Amino acid sequence: MKLPNLTLSPRQILDDVALCLVFFTRLPLPDLDFRGRGLAAAIWAAPVAGLLVGLIGAIVFATAERFGLAMGPAAALALVATVIATGCLHEDGLSDVADGFGGGKSRGRKLDIMRDSRIGAYGAMALALSLLIRWNVLSELVDPTQALFALVAAHAASRGVLGAFMHLLPPARSDGLSAGAGAVSLETAIAGAVLGAIPLLLLGAGGAIAALILLGLLFAAFHALCLNQIGGQTGDTIGALQQVSEIAVLLVASVALSS
């Protein structure tokens, strides 16, 4: 199989997908031998994990609607399902970044706050707004098919940008999760971005283009923000980027799917 400038054997593809499922979800998987391939090499497959998380949310949404629940409760249950599936991995990053960037005065202090497991006012507000916006968008969708398209597109595309972020920004600390993952190659970053962009076609041509433009603007802004605040990226900033990207795609989906 050949991805953009990235040739992998079938075994490597399976290894990379499995590694991303293990890292980005809490789904029960058997013990696997990844044969030395780390997250930096496998990050192109992150959209596959996102697609699966989106499918889980969509199935819960459709099941709830089938049993007569209104769109609001169905959307809430779908959100709960996706959060459980990921173990709040990205939400944790969002709250840590909000606390660190909002409360720290120096680069070192910001990184210290981000490492602290306690949540502050900035982090709590960021989490609340993230959940509120996502719930509101999903609750306004008119049927489970729209929920399926929106969730799959948002979860896949929001993970497709992560490899590029890791490629373009150096680790902000030498001992963090991101530093331990290693360097992401340009080929791997491109492969992940392309794979993550494909499900955006579920939003129609106009929706896909709008989502790509918005994702590009958010990516550039967050890239500049992280450089300014901490001089690079960490696992928390990667999680925060996923969250804001997911929200962006959901907002585009709410317009594209209703027109």
Swiss-Prot record:
The reaction(s) catalysed by this protein are: alpha-ribazole + adenosylcob(III)inamide-GDP = adenosylcob(III)alamin + GMP + H(+); alpha-ribazole 5'-phosphate + adenosylcob(III)inamide-GDP = adenosylcob(III)alamin 5'-phosphate + GMP + H(+)
Do you know which Pfam families this protein is assigned to?
Answer: CobS
The places in or outside the cell where this protein is found are: Cell inner membrane
| Keyword line | Cell inner membrane, Cell membrane, Cobalamin biosynthesis, Magnesium, Membrane, Transferase, Transmembrane, Transmembrane helix
Q: Does the keyword Chaperone apply?
A: no
Per its Swiss-Prot or TrEMBL entry, what cofactor is needed?
Mg(2+)
Q: How does it sit in the membrane?
A: Multi-pass membrane protein
GO CC entries: plasma membrane
GO terms classed as biological process: cobalamin biosynthetic process
Give the family from UniProt.
Belongs to the CobS family.
Q: Which NCBIfam families match?
A: cobS (TIGR00317)
* Protein name per the record: Adenosylcobinamide-GDP ribazoletransferase
Taxonomic lineage is:
Bacteria, Pseudomonadati, Pseudomonadota, Alphaproteobacteria, Hyphomicrobiales
Gene name per UniProt = cobS
